[in-house]
Amino acid sequence: MSSAQPATGRAAPGGAAAGRAGRHLGLALLVIATAQLMVVLDATIVNVALPHVQRALGFSGTGLEWVVNAYALTFGGLLLLGGRAGDILGRRRVFIAGIILFSVASLLGGFATTQAWLLAARAAQGVGGAIIAPTALSLVTTTFPEGPPRNRAMGVYAAMSIGGAAVGLIAGGLLTTYLSWRWVLFVNVPIGAVVAILAPRAFAESERRPGRFDLPGAITSTLGLAALVYGLTSAATTPNGVSHWGDTKVIASLTAAVVLLVSFVFIESRSPHALMPLRIFRNRNRSAANLIMLCIGTAMFGMFFFLTIFVQTVWGYSALRSGIAFLPMVATIMVMAGVSAQLVPRIGARPLLIAGSAIAGGGMFWLSRITEHSHYVSGLLGPM
């Protein structure tokens, strides 16, 4: 009897503790999902508003690309550094700092009156996103216990990563059509404020790990990619057939890109705290898969940028209609991502990579035939 009493006495508190733990995990999942949605949202929400941004601030065709590039380059170039910062300084602290930076940059970008102002804000958004994304993923693994809770959290994280693109298309169209292009940036401010307020309640601070930042690697890779993109976009042939490959600024930027990227490889081969240890490329399958994803991602970014401008300026679509027009593509990606995950254990990754690359290449070629007289179904929906 005496041994039964302590067990009975602990039952109620145990149930209450379990309830509190459940609420805590629910809040944590809400914060992580919202933060990831906010980061992914900006990959598409601004695209739909690009023609309006161009008219408002007077961007040229090549200059307008940098509204997208400024975000993508800083986000991609500093992503690994953002993850390292969370390990060294504490994940919750760094996560909140990233949210605040992203929100402030969005606010400033919404008030932009010059091209340089908007591009600087977009670059700052990318830095914030590069901090948020890896620390949010780390918080999933440190907050949720292994098993079903963590699996569910990872599923929600992945769903936000994919579904955020669809939300961005619709939200960008609605905000641009009924309010202003500036609201595709302002919308992040209240979302970020809520996440920043709830994050301290949702997460415990992680232990700091000793380590060093690979700043030389982060700087050379980001600047090298920026120089490469600038050189390639500046070298584009104009509509009247004039090529700029021989221009001094093109040659200088491409030379700088080579020097910086070679320096990055050298730094990573010598640094004990390398952001991208070169040994990861010893696995041929992993290297090939990463190369394919690089090619597909590059093509998708270029395609989406071009089509957004095309359907609004040539076909006369509104921002909302263009966002809806791209939804089937996002839906197809979401469905096929689930299908391919089921097929990998059965037939292996290589056949799927080959088939997927071939289908994507065929779709890109089909899209290259689009004209002002093309119909939506045959000219856009089919190849997408």
What is the predicted role of each segment?
Residues 1-41, 55:
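Cytosolic juxtamembrane N-terminal segment immediately preceding the first transmembrane helix
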Residues 29-74, 180, 245-256, 260, ...:
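Transmembrane core module of solute transporters
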Residues 33, 76, 81, 96, ...:
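Small-residue-rich packing faces within the transmembrane alpha-helices of Major Facilitator Superfamily
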Residues 39, 68-71, 75, 102, ...:
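Structural signature of transmembrane alpha-helices in multi-pass secondary transporters
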Residues 41, 45, 77, 81, ...:
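Residue positions within transmembrane alpha-helices of multi-pass solute transporters
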Residues 52, 83-84, 88, 174, ...:
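Membrane-interface helix termini in secondary transporters
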Residues 87-217, 221, 234, 323:
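Helix-loop-helix hairpins in multi-pass membrane proteins, especially solute transporters
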Residues 177-292, 299, 317:
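Hydrophobic transmembrane-helix bundles of small-molecule transporters
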